[in-house]
């Protein structure tokens, strides 16, 4: 397995070659130990854990999705979020070149500063976006409750509340 600019590119065009498969279990165990132990700042730990997971690249497919999912789970695991609701995929996708370059700089230099600066910026931006989304949902809830909450049916308001408590997409 290797990572190239385009799917199907030969290994000669690889931009990253993950460790050989016989090292993967040890590297994943090391990553889990890192997540569970230590006193580092939670965001630093989440950022480094994401990089390390991407570097180990333990699966043939889905590493990016799982690596991005790891971020809110690390923060949640360390009890800094009530729910694992911080999703950076949108930001990483919108800034893909910068994201990949920041990860690659760690590979080249062993220095996490550029990666962590990008990571912190992505967290801050995504938190702002999440806050806006939550505010919009509350506003929508208030509008709908005000519009339909005074209806004649005693079931309408509980129905509206149920939709907002357990949305189905």
Residues covered by each model-derived region:
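FIC/Doc superfamily catalytic core
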Residues: 1-169
């Amino acid at each position: 397995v290797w990572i190239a600019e385009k799917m199907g590119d030969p290994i000669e065009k690889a931009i990253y070659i993950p460790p050989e498969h016989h090292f993967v279990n040890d590297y994943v165990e090391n990553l889990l130990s890192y997540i569970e132990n230590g006193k580092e700042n939670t965001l630093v730990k989440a950022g480094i854990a994401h990089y390390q997971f991407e570097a180990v690249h333990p699966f043939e497919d889905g590493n990016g999705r799982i690596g991005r999912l790891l971020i809110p789970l690390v923060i949640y695991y360390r009890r800094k979020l009530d729910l694992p609701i911080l999703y950076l995929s949108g930001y990483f996708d919108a800034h893909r070149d910068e994201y990949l370059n920041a990860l690659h700089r760690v590979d080249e230099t062993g220095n996490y500063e550029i990666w962590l600066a990008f990571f912190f910026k992505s967290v801050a931006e995504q938190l702002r976006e999440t806050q806006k989304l939550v505010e919009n949902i509350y506003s929508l809830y208030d509008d709908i409750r005000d519009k339909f909450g005074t209806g004649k049916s005693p079931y309408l308001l509980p129905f509206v509340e149920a939709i907002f408590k357990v949305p189905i997409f």
